[in-house]
Amino acid sequence: MENDKGQLVELYVPRKCSATNRIIKADDHASVQINVAKVDEEGRAIPGEYITYALSGYVRSRGESDDSLNRLAQNDGLLKNVWSYSR
């Protein structure tokens, strides 16, 4: 919902799981949001530049969060040459 100035005034904005594209419900207390910082050539974090991943409790309970995070980071160009069983 927006106010008369066009600003978002929702109390709860639903998120989607980055791995499955399922909506993360408000009562999913096992879900996590992970920010991965972008780094410069020297390996130092660049302030204010990061990529956010949201993982639902469903993905975490099945033990797929590490593989999902590796896959998402490879697609975003953060990781190279990570071994995967599915390949």
Swiss-Prot record:
Pfam families: Ribosomal_S21e. N-terminally acetylated by acetyltransferase NatB. GO terms for molecular function: structural constituent of ribosome. The modification N-acetylmethionine is found at residue 1. Keywords: Acetylation, Cytoplasm, Ribonucleoprotein, Ribosomal protein, rRNA processing. One of its GO terms (biological process) is endonucleolytic cleavage in ITS1 to separate SSU-rRNA from 5.8S rRNA and LSU-rRNA from tricistronic rRNA transcript (SSU-rRNA, 5.8S rRNA, LSU-rRNA). One of its GO terms (cellular component) is cytosol. Its main location: cytoplasm. It comes from the Eukaryota. Disruption phenotype: Reduction in growth rate, a decrease in free 40S subunits, an increase in the amount of free 60S subunits and a decrease in polysome size. It is found in: Cytoplasm. Belongs to the eukaryotic ribosomal protein eS21 family. Component of the ribosome, a large ribonucleoprotein complex responsible for the synthesis of proteins in the cell. The small ribosomal subunit (SSU) binds messenger RNAs (mRNAs) and translates the encoded message by selecting cognate aminoacyl-transfer RNA (tRNA) molecules. The large subunit (LSU) contains the ribosomal catalytic site termed the peptidyl transferase center (PTC), which catalyzes the formation of peptide bonds, thereby polymerizing the amino acids delivered by tRNAs into a polypeptide chain. PANTHER family: 40S RIBOSOMAL PROTEIN S21. Present with 15300 molecules/cell in log phase SD medium. There are 2 genes for eS21 in yeast. Component of the small ribosomal subunit (SSU). Mature yeast ribosomes consist of a small (40S) and a large (60S) subunit. The 40S small subunit contains 1 molecule of ribosomal RNA (18S rRNA) and 33 different proteins (encoded by 57 genes). The large 60S subunit contains 3 rRNA molecules (25S, 5.8S and 5S rRNA) and 46 different proteins (encoded by 81 genes). This is Small ribosomal subunit protein eS21B.
